[in-house]
């Protein structure tokens, strides 16, 4: 009956929705939120309690930085039964689509997925342990980190990460608007600026 979709959901999927279904946009982009998260949570509960069949369409996996946990918690507390259809996380699917392996037996035997925009700073100080992250030999994947790229880069180098470490910045992966910039930890901020990649 209703599809509540977000910014990262593929528009081609919306073309498959029944003609009589209601489409509600609940997207978030950087600091521009069409609906605040609590409003999305309340909307999902309201629609379900009205007896409507509701699809919450998200890009990637809803439980990996997708706020699916928050939405599911709200539905559970309201007594609403729901089903999760796991998605394929952009943390590994987008690099693969771009030809960048996140693991390789000669270079990286692990990968680590990290938020690129923390919502839980303590007095303006990052709660991420950049000292530990800088020592990791595996691939570091920062999701939604473009706006904070200069801070991420500086924090890693200040804590000992080799400035020659290869870096890729991937934007809107697997879509017609996909952008890829590659460089090193030392120059990736300049490369991204030169390529005109912005949030």
Residue ranges and their predicted role:
Residues 2, 39, 49-54, 110, ...:
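A contiguous loop/helix-start segment that scaffolds small-molecule binding in enzyme catalytic cores
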Residues 3, 21-28, 81-83, 102-109, ...:
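Short hydrophobic/aromatic-enriched beta-strand-loop microsegments
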Residues 59-136, 179-182, 186:
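Class I SAM-dependent methyltransferase SAM-binding "motif I" and its flanking Rossmann-like core
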Residues 1-88, 93, 189:
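Class I S-adenosyl-L-methionine
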Residues 14-15, 46, 103-104, 131-132, ...:
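Short secondary-structure boundary/capping segments
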Residues 22-36, 107-117, 141:
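Acidic/glycine-enriched edge-of-secondary-structure segments
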